[in-house]
Amino acid sequence: FLPIIASVAAKLIPSIVCRITKKC
């Protein structure tokens, strides 16, 4: 359960930061 959330968060967080800061 937790490993799945961690892996999803690891993919989502960088993309969110990428969109907000526009640094990819």
Swiss-Prot record:
Tissues expressing this chain: Expressed by the skin glands.
Keyword Secreted: yes
GO aspect biological process, one term: defense response to bacterium
GO cellular component, one term: extracellular region
UniProt KW keywords: Amphibian defense peptide, Antibiotic, Antimicrobial, Cytolysis, Disulfide bond, Fungicide, Hemolysis, Secreted
Keyword presence, Secreted: yes
Localization in the cell: Secreted
Transmembrane parts of this sequence: none
Disulphides: C18-C24
Function text: Antimicrobial peptide with activity against Gram-negative and Gram-positive bacteria and fungi. Also shows hemolytic activity.
Family membership: Belongs to the frog skin active peptide (FSAP) family. Brevinin subfamily.
Name listed for the protein in its UniProt record: Brevinin-1SPc
The organism's taxonomic lineage, starting at the top: Eukaryota, Metazoa, Chordata, Craniata, Vertebrata
